[in-house]
Amino acid sequence: MSINSITSYLGISGRNFIVFILVGFFAIQNLAFQIIFRLNIPYSIDFSDVFSPVFNQIVKDEFSLFITKGIHIILFPKLISYPNFYLNSFDVVNLTYIYWIVTSITLFVMYLMIKQTDKRLFWTLIPISAFLYNPLTSSGYWMVGMLSWYFPMLGITSIIYLLNRKTINLKIFASGVSLAIFSTFSILLGVVSWIAGITVLLKAVSEKRLENKKWILLWIISSIIVGFCYLFLTYGTTDSETHFEVLFSFTGFSFISNFIASSFRLKFEILMLLAGTL
């Protein structure tokens, strides 16, 4: 069977077929890496933050799902880990497969986002998948601890896709709020999901794609309610004082800009600031 007949059967262009093949290659080689080596290393930099509480929950019957790491509430990674630890004798190999599934779903949502906006950008899935499935950055050592970081990635990506539609109903909105809560209670970085959601909604209103502005108000109310719940759960859980005023200083701006531009690895700080700002 020729490539032309395959692409005709699938209803995609030859260029997109090449993108599909390359993305599939990166995904398969990463999964093969996990299956062949089965790196069951029950330790990572975030082990004590995610798995020690789960261990105490099972062994000592201590309710520890809401135990915080500083001001991080790593709830959903613990909920995912709990049945695996309990039923699988604390083997963490299965969690590396969950990482692969989460990454693949995120990449698929990115595909839907591109299809929703500009199909000419399908080629960007190649470098994105190369980074996400790179064994050097997703080894068995890091995968287990990285679940708490990849959950917000999935949540934020899905929120942007859902709220960027021409029409928003209660079901779509509730799904967006649920994903934002999922991201927020996976790690503190997940609060960005609320910013992503309001940004998409405001953009839709400015472009006159969203006539009913009640969704913006409901999104703000939801974020405030969840924010108060988060502060209630984290209040008094850390010995170090939290200085929120720093966020509104140049130091806070510099930190956020450098964080956004971290993937560029620029040599000078001023370049990182410019990249993060732009």
Short names for language-model regions:
Residues 1-30:
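Start-transfer (signal-anchor) and selected internal transmembrane alpha helices
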Residues 4-5, 192-228:
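Perimembrane helix-loop-helix junctions
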Residues 81-85, 95-109, 148, 152-155, ...:
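Transmembrane alpha-helices of multi-pass, membrane-embedded glycan-processing enzymes
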Residues 97-124, 158-162:
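Transmembrane-helix motifs of polytopic, lipid-linked glycan transferases
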Residues 123-154:
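Aromatic- and kink-enriched transmembrane "portal" helix at the membrane-lumen/periplasm boundary
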Residues 151, 156-173:
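Membrane-interface transmembrane helices that cradle and orient dolichyl/undecaprenyl
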Residues 172-199:
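Membrane-interface alpha helices of multi-pass inner-membrane proteins
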